[in-house]
């Protein structure tokens, strides 16, 4: 966190990997990744998975799946607060799956931090959890849907049921409760992704 020199090294490696694979477009479901690539590698075309799903269409099995689900509140992640197309496309997807939802008073470009921003939970856990509870308490809905893994987990820690939009779309057996991933699990996921990229490079 804050180590720009190490960030530049990592980001340069990412660009080399993409170049080696001949990738001209990156699709991401992570709002932090979206803004990082858009900001520091503007020559790379970055596409939000949520916008892509609107373009190509949802699986038929997902359409209207949640028309009888209890209303949820929609939390917009901080990193893409100014990305109006993503805001629009996420709401389009919610309408397509039939989910009843309400907006937070402070949403879209005025959204509030979920409590995980800037790795606050690692540096000031008490303040992070206070913000998680504050944000979660700003709706009477028991469940809060977001399109960011960290945000969904934060809403759980804040006392509500945090739900990720992709689970609502692709996981028909989802139990309406975001499972928390520990630091080790998240690290392993990143390591596995790194291994897959290396394998792709070896085959090009």
Set out the residue ranges of the language-model regions:
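Iron-sulfur cluster-binding electron-transfer modules in prokaryotic oxidoreductases
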Residues: 1-204
């Amino acid at each position: 966190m804050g180590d720009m020199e190490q960030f530049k090294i990592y980001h340069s490696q990412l660009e080399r990997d993409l170049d080696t694979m001949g990738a001209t477009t990156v699709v991401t479901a992570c709002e932090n990744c979206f803004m990082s690539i858009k900001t520091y590698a503007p020559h790379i075309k970055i596409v939000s998975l949520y916008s892509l799903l609107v373009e190509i269409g949802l699986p038929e099995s997902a359409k209207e799946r949640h028309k009888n689900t209890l209303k949820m509140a929609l939390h917009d992640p901080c990193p893409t607060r100014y990305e109006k197309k993503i805001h629009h496309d996420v709401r389009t997807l919610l309408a397509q799956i039939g989910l009843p939802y309400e907006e937070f008073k402070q949403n879209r470009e005025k959204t509030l931090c979920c409590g995980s921003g800037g790795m606050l939970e690692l540096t000031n856990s008490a303040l992070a959890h206070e913000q998680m509870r504050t944000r979660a308490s700003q709706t009477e809905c028991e469940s809060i849907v977001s399109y960011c893994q960290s945000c969904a987990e934060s809403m759980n820690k804040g006392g509500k049921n945090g739900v990720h939009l992709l689970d609502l779309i692709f996981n028909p057996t989802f139990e309406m409760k975001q499972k928390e991933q520990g630091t080790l699990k998240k690290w392993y996921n990143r390591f596995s992704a790194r291994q897959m990229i290396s394998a792709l490079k070896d085959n090009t």
